[in-house]
Amino acid sequence: MSRVSFIDTTVLCNLVPVPGRDQNADEVRREMKERLARGERFILPITSVVETGNFIAQVSDGQLRRQTAEKLAAILNLICEGKAPWVLHDVAWDRAFLKTLLDGADTMSSYVEHAVNKVGAGDLCIITERFYFQERSSVRAGIWTFDAGLRAHA
């Protein structure tokens, strides 16, 4: 399998784009083209979908909110259909996932230590989801993000 990257909310909001959260949209589109040309594949972690969906729900203009929601829905449908460059990653939200999250996945720091260092639970969920993907697939995966705290673990 070619390189795989988990897409953080900061990038997904620019890909959709979500009004007010798309300040890097041109840069993201340009980088997406470069990554696609290299054969990179992408996974949308649950956290990114939920957070982006919440940001869309906060768009004040109803028509723009609908158009933006339709764009995110189109991306999610491509994932459901297994269409490249998207990879569907099945992950269970269960006791094992929560325990791994609390242990900090493969970061060698607990959730509490991450929180103290300003790495949120959402970011740690992405790290944990990536950990499970790598364990199951034996494919090293990165995280594409603009978030400095998360980038330290990308």
Predicted regions and their residues:
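Acidic, glycine-rich loop-and-strand cores that form catalytic or ligand-binding grooves
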Residues: K71-I79
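Surface-exposed alpha-helical segments enriched in charged/polar residues
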Residues: R30-A37, N77, T128-F131
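Short active-site loop/helix that positions an aromatic residue
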Residues: A152-A154
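Active-site neighborhoods of divalent-metal-dependent phosphate/nucleic-acid chemistry enzymes
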Residues: C80-G149
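Phosphate-coordination/substrate-recognition cap region in phosphate-metabolizing enzymes
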Residues: E51
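Short, well-structured N-terminal submotif of metal-dependent ribonuclease cores
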Residues: M1-T47, F55-L72
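Alpha-helix capping/helix-boundary segments
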Residues: V11, S48, I126, G149-L150
